């Protein structure tokens, strides 16, 4: 009876210690994700072009998604199992473990809802810039003054076109 209680106490201590280790790493990952996403949302995005590190992050996410889709086409399992199912070297050094952890963290960041929302906003900004260049090309072909004035919504209309019969006091 005492031996059984001792085993139960050891098992609970082991469980609590493993949960605390897991929660620390999960908290670190969540803090990293939160820091990265707040930096994305806090910095202002210029209408001309986004900062280079944000585009690099978008490119990295698309690269990771392309790798995952290529692995799925090759017949591998779900997205969660992609890192685990790849052939790993027999001897894992610190660099390979850190690289695998980094890839896994990048996958989680790319799949997070906040980043996907930011990516959609970024694509809309880039598409909006392309639409403006298309409109400017149309203006260059047809140069009428009225069309050019109607195209730019952000400029206020000047009140120099007035009726001759109106009086101002």
Curated annotation (Swiss-Prot):
The record marks 159-161 as: Cleavage. Keywords: Cleavage on pair of basic residues, Cytoplasmic vesicle, Secreted, Signal, Vasoactive. The keyword Secreted applies. It comes from Rattus norvegicus. It is found in: Secreted; Cytoplasmic vesicle, Secretory vesicle. This is Neurotensin/neuromedin N. Its main location: secreted. GO terms for cellular component: axon terminus; extracellular region; neuronal cell body; transport vesicle. The lineage of its organism: Eukaryota, Metazoa, Chordata, Craniata, Vertebrata. InterPro entries: NeurotensiN (IPR008055). Interacts with NTSR1. Interacts with SORT1. Interacts with SORL1. One of its GO terms (molecular function) is receptor ligand activity. Pfam families: Pro-NT_NN. Residues 1-22 form the signal peptide. One of its GO terms (biological process) is response to mineralocorticoid. Neurotensin may play an endocrine or paracrine role in the regulation of fat metabolism. It causes contraction of smooth muscle. Belongs to the neurotensin family.
């Amino acid at each position: 009876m005492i031996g059984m209680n001792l085993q139960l106490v050891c098992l609970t201590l082991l469980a609590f210690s493993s949960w605390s280790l897991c929660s620390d790493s999960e908290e670190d990952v969540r803090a990293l994700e939160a820091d990265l996403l707040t930096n994305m949302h806090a910095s202002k995005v210029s209408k001309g072009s986004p900062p280079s590190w944000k585009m690099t992050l978008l490119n990295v996410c698309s690269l990771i998604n392309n790798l995952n889709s290529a692995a799925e086409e090759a017949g591998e399992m779900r997205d969660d199992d992609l890192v685990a199912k790849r052939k790993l070297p027999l001897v894992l050094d610190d660099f390979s473990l850190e690289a695998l952890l980094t890839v896994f963290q990048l996958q989680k960041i790319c799949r997070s809802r906040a980043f996907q929302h930011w990516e959609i906003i970024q694509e809309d900004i880039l598409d909006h810039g392309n639409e403006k260049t298309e409109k400017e090309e149309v203006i260059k072909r047809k140069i009428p003054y009225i069309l050019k004035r109607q195209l730019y919504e952000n400029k206020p209309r000047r009140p120099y076109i007035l009726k001759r019969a109106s009086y101002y006091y």
